[in-house]
Amino acid sequence: MNRTFRILAICLFALAASTARAQSPAQHIGAVLDDWHQAAAAADEARYFGHFAPNGVFMGTDATERWTVAEFRAWAKPRFQKKSTWTFKPHDRHVEFSTDRKTAWFDEMLDTLDLGLCRGSGVLVLSGGTWKIAQYNLSVPIPNAMVDGVVKQIHAH
């Protein structure tokens, strides 16, 4: 009886441990994005750009900033070399999936040191069993009460 109980306990423990490690698809996307943000903060260029799909696009806060991965990497390279990159702390993330579960889109709020509160949104594609960032869009949300003034400044620019 004691031996049977031990075997049963070991099996239940193994099952519980494997269930605890299993991530939902949304958690898996979150882990990819978290690692991507952490790679930027650590100035780990290879890890950071390894998260992009080959035909990925990064859109920055300026209207002129629509970069292919190669263009974005060229712009960012000096920052990674100097170890003076950026730190984004994500929260309030939402993830959705296509019906075939091969495409995911998300939005997240970001606490940043330089820009304050930002929003990131984007699309990931499943490629060879790995989620890759196909598009990322960084924006600075403007409170509605300030929009008119900001629009005037943009027009005057």
Language model: regions and residue ranges:
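Short beta-strand edge/turn micro-motifs at domain boundaries
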Residues: 117-147
